[in-house]
Amino acid sequence: MNQRIWINIALLVVIFVLSVIIFFNKHEIEDELLPLSSINPKSIININVQRKNLDNLFFSKSDGVWNMITPLQFQANRARIESILKILETKSYKQFNLDEVDIAQFALRSPAVILELNENKFSFGTNNPINQRRYILFDKKIHMIDDFHFPQLTTKAAYFAETKLLPDTMNIISIRFPEYTIQLNNGKWQASIPEYNEEKVKKIINKWKEIIAISVSKYEKQEGQKTITINSMSGQEINFAIVTTDPYLILGREDLGIQYNMGMDDAKQMFLKTYLKN
């Protein structure tokens, strides 16, 4: 090999070694960063989100279950609540004492969002234009953290709803569809349309027990919409409005103010006779 090739190989080796050193140094530095707080997420039972120009959100935990109390009332999605609580353990990349800075430069004099976890308050300011990390005020210090939480806290209330249509504890005894009914009769599942056997009906029941929506949005009532009514052994009754079937199935809970956007494959397995147009 000529000298130029050897020089190029040496340069590549140097670049590789430097990249490895930078990579591991970065991770060592991040490992040394302190968490934003020492608060145990499991100790939190109330979440209050005050939002400028948006509805405030309030969640409360009872018997291990999170529920939204305002502006809507429904069981909250556990994973999305846990995502909020992760702010307690997020890394603080930089801190400023309040007597060293003007909080106005961080847009913290009138925060866009104030998150209260029990009695602990986190005020959200602007983000850093270079690294896009967010400035927040907590425990009399301004911290710079990864900006994962602000977008979530400024989304619509329905985003936090549980995506599973029925509670795990619901023991179904009947489902009334617009044109037919399936119900438990003397320990056997039957349909009001006789061409369907018990095995087929059981599959429908099991699908409703486990079905999960792709997403949840604010309820939008439509004229002439039909209703699906589900009854349980305990006497509970849940009504789903068929908001639309085109281009995909949307089921509404008018009592909760939300609607479920269903996947096409799942939707086809929820009915004996399909309402889908595709």
State where each predicted segment sits.
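A short-motif feature that recognizes glycine-rich, charge-decorated loops
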Residues: 1-278
